Amino acid sequence: MATTHLDVCAVVPAAGFGRRMQTECPKQYLSIGNQTILEHSVHALLAHPRVTRVVIAISPGDSRFAKLPLANHPQITVVDGGDERADSVLAGLKAAGDAQWVLVHDAARPCLHQDDLARLLALSETSRTGGILAAPVRDTMKRAEPGKNAIAHTVDRNGLWHALTPQFFPRELLHDCLTRALNEGATITDEASALEYCGFHPQLVEGRADNIKVTRPEDLALAEFYLTRTIHQENT
């Protein structure tokens, strides 16, 4: 059985640009209220007492991060990220010190709820593999014909989940799985897929569907609505 109540290091890959946002500014530096999306995402992690450090992987040419209050935060370490998400996560893991467990969270996912985070972190008490926040698929899913915008067939949504973040794993296990998957040319779309590639089966922890990732222009207003609602609920 896993050890309980260990301090956790979080890794936030923030070296991407996000061209689908159609802005010159990387999406993690767009503002919601008086903070950037990145700040909202990081503060949600640090709000939990078990998260004692956050490692943020930024682009080597990033000049925006140094202007944020996060740059001088005592619990934050900054490292150079890589060309791909997995490279940035590996750079973050190397800076995570001797942390036994690590969270990986999207820089552009600012609406994380504390109850979801707490339930995910509880996996360290029962699991040796870890798991991810995820939401059951609710919509009818269609598969397109190859190379066409035409329906091939309807996909059975039973058992389908939307993968969210944070994702939570033993540090050494995640490091080894990411390294092997990259060395063998596997397609890695999130951290859990690296563990899957190596034969592990992380847990699915149901999280709120409003834990959205800001990817397209219309997501910004939706994230602002969710954050404003959460702040209002916490203050009433």
From Swiss-Prot:
SUPFAM superfamilies per UniProt: Nucleotide-diphospho-sugar transferases
Coiled coil: none
GO molecular function: 2-C-methyl-D-erythritol 4-phosphate cytidylyltransferase activity
Classification via InterPro entries: IspD (IPR001228), IspD/TarI (IPR034683), IspD/TarI_cytidylyltransf_bact (IPR050088), ISPD_synthase_CS (IPR018294), Nucleotide-diphossugar_trans (IPR029044)
Catalytic activity: 2-C-methyl-D-erythritol 4-phosphate + CTP + H(+) = 4-CDP-2-C-methyl-D-erythritol + diphosphate
Keyword terms of this UniProt record: Isoprene biosynthesis, Nucleotidyltransferase, Transferase
One protein family per Pfam: IspD
Enzyme class: transferase
Listed Gene3D superfamilies: Spore Coat Polysaccharide Biosynthesis Protein SpsA, Chain A (3.90.550.10)
One GO term of the biological process aspect: isopentenyl diphosphate biosynthetic process, methylerythritol 4-phosphate pathway
UniProt site (Transition state stabilizer): R20, K27
Site (Positions MEP for the nucleophilic attack) residue list: R157, K213
Entry's EC annotation: 2.7.7.60
Protein's pathway: Isoprenoid biosynthesis; isopentenyl diphosphate biosynthesis via DXP pathway; isopentenyl diphosphate from 1-deoxy-D-xylulose 5-phosphate: step 2/6
PANTHER family xrefs: 2-C-METHYL-D-ERYTHRITOL 4-PHOSPHATE CYTIDYLYLTRANSFERASE, CHLOROPLASTIC
NCBIfam families: ispD
Described purpose of this protein according to its UniProt entry: Catalyzes the formation of 4-diphosphocytidyl-2-C-methyl-D-erythritol from CTP and 2-C-methyl-D-erythritol 4-phosphate (MEP).
Homology family: Belongs to the IspD/TarI cytidylyltransferase family. IspD subfamily.
Subunit structure: Homodimer.
Name used for this protein in its record: 2-C-methyl-D-erythritol 4-phosphate cytidylyltransferase
Organism expressing this protein natively: Escherichia coli (strain SMS-3-5 / SECEC)
